[in-house]
Amino acid sequence: MKYQQLENLESGWKWKYLVKKHREGELITRYVEASAAQEAVEMLLTLENEPVRVNVWIEEHLNPALFNRLKQTIRARRKRHFNAEHQHTRKKSIDLEFLVWQRLAGLAQRRGKTLSETIVQLIEDAENKEKYATKMSSLKQDLQALLGKE
């Protein structure tokens, strides 16, 4: 396993995820009967600061359809948590208009690169173009100076 599991922290994430899903109207319990489901949800709501009991609740009451999604969410959250510790792995966000993002995504796809790699490539292309323009301007001035002196 690449990232260390932190039981207490991850239980808090699981609790928040399940409460959010419940508030969004998803069935988070395995029970079909509304009263049993409501009772299990009320029990979950009291367990916010009890990580061990949150995990027991999940084993006993979680809707099987949510199990894989919960695991994937926690795995992604764990990765973001550990990557955020180091500057070079921390993700940054930028605001792009949708059409700009769409064009960038299309270019990245055509080049077979990630969005980040495509942005770096575009920056390098622009820098090379600047260097070329500066060099050509310098050569042009030198040529004019040579022709002007004769």
UniProtKB/Swiss-Prot annotation:
Keywords: Cell cycle, Cell division, Cytoplasm, DNA-binding
Domain of life per record: Bacteria
Gene Ontology molecular-function annotations: sequence-specific DNA binding
InterPro entries xrefs: Arc_rbn_hlx_hlx, MatP, MatP_C, MatP_N, MatP_N_sf
Main localization, broad class: cytoplasm
Keyword Cytoplasm: yes
Spans through the membrane: none
Cellular component terms (Gene Ontology): cytoplasm
Location of the protein in the cell: Cytoplasm
Biological process according to GO: cell division; regulation of DNA-templated transcription
Quaternary data: Homodimer.
Function statement: Required for spatial organization of the terminus region of the chromosome (Ter macrodomain) during the cell cycle. Prevents early segregation of duplicated Ter macrodomains during cell division. Binds specifically to matS, which is a 13 bp signature motif repeated within the Ter macrodomain.
Annotated family: Belongs to the MatP family.
NCBIfam families on file: PRK05097.1
Protein name (record): Macrodomain Ter protein
Species name: Citrobacter rodentium (strain ICC168)
Gene name in the database record: matP
